[in-house]
Amino acid sequence: MKCIVGLGNIGKRFELTRHNIGFEVVDYILEKNNFSLDKQKFKGAYTIERMNGDKVLFIEPMTMMNLSGEAVAPIMDYYNVNPEDLIVLYDDLDLEQGQVRLRQKGSAGGHNGMKSIIKMLGTDQFKRIRIGVGRPTNGMTVPDYVLQRFSNDEMVTMEKVIEHAGRAIEKFVETSRFDHVMNEFNGEVK
């Protein structure tokens, strides 16, 4: 069973913020397929659905971002999901808006939600889709920036990015060939 995790912070005030882009992609896939996060356990909202005949576990941690691993690891453990079947979607300050990077494995790169997942799983050997949100300008702090909502102009780009990342997930579920998905979906979304 594949496991798709979108990272974000819970609560209305965090909706459509840069830090919640992982939630937005998972929500896009769920809505497109008429699925919903119908279970809550282990500090997470999740569902198990069938896509292309395969079971897929979708998770949105109901912790704050920095504790995401406290939701992801127990749910994966409960359903016997191996880290190699995990893909985590999250915001990345080091990529410009409109950039998407798929990777087989790697460090947290300073992202506290990823640090928590790596710590709780005891490995960084899992797939991830990094979604560029750019860096703050005009002296804004990083926390203020990532917790800020996208402007209307930015949302035009980010809606394309959300759809693009959603298609990458669907392609991976369909083919199980993350190397091919990386070749097709890495880069700037036009």
From Swiss-Prot:
Its main location: cytoplasm. TRNA binds at F14, M64, N66, N112. Its EC number is 3.1.1.29. Keywords: Cytoplasm, Hydrolase, RNA-binding, tRNA-binding. GO terms for biological process: protein quality control for misfolded or incompletely synthesized proteins; rescue of stalled ribosome. It is an enzyme of class 3 (hydrolase). The record marks D91 as: Stabilizes the basic form of H active site to accept a proton. It is found in: Cytoplasm. The active site is at H19. GO terms for cellular component: cytoplasm. The record marks N9 as: Discriminates between blocked and unblocked aminoacyl-tRNA. It catalyses: an N-acyl-L-alpha-aminoacyl-tRNA + H2O = an N-acyl-L-amino acid + a tRNA + H(+). Monomer. Hydrolyzes ribosome-free peptidyl-tRNAs (with 1 or more amino acids incorporated), which drop off the ribosome during protein synthesis, or as a result of ribosome stalling. Belongs to the PTH family. This is Peptidyl-tRNA hydrolase. It comes from Staphylococcus aureus (strain bovine RF122 / ET3-1).
